[in-house]
Swiss-Prot record:
Gene (UniProt): rpmE
InterPro entries, per database record: Ribosomal_bL28/bL31-like_sf, Ribosomal_bL31, Ribosomal_bL31_A, Ribosomal_bL31_sf
Annotated positions binding Zn(2+): 16, 18, 37, 40
Coiled coil (UniProt feature): none
Official protein name in the record: Large ribosomal subunit protein bL31
Family (UniProt): Belongs to the bacterial ribosomal protein bL31 family. Type A subfamily.
Organism expressing this protein natively: Pseudomonas syringae pv. tomato (strain ATCC BAA-871 / DC3000)
Gene3D superfamilies given in the database record: Ribosomal protein L31
Pfam assignment, any one: Ribosomal_L31
Amino acid sequence: MKADIHPVYEAIDATCSCGNVIKTRSTLTGPLSLDVCNECHPFYTGKQKTLDIGGRVDKFKSRFGAFGATKAKQD
């Protein structure tokens, strides 16, 4: 194997927008800024919102449900 072909893998601090600091290793130099982390992301904190899209489906079916259906023959 060739010597000195791999980048330096150093310990850095990744700082989240909420102030949480995570120590990690990377080829990047200097501190890293994160938008979200496990301390502030809604999925991990349990504050996630569940969207109810059932109303949209019902609205679509009411508008286009009969589209393409054959008309009943009149006697």
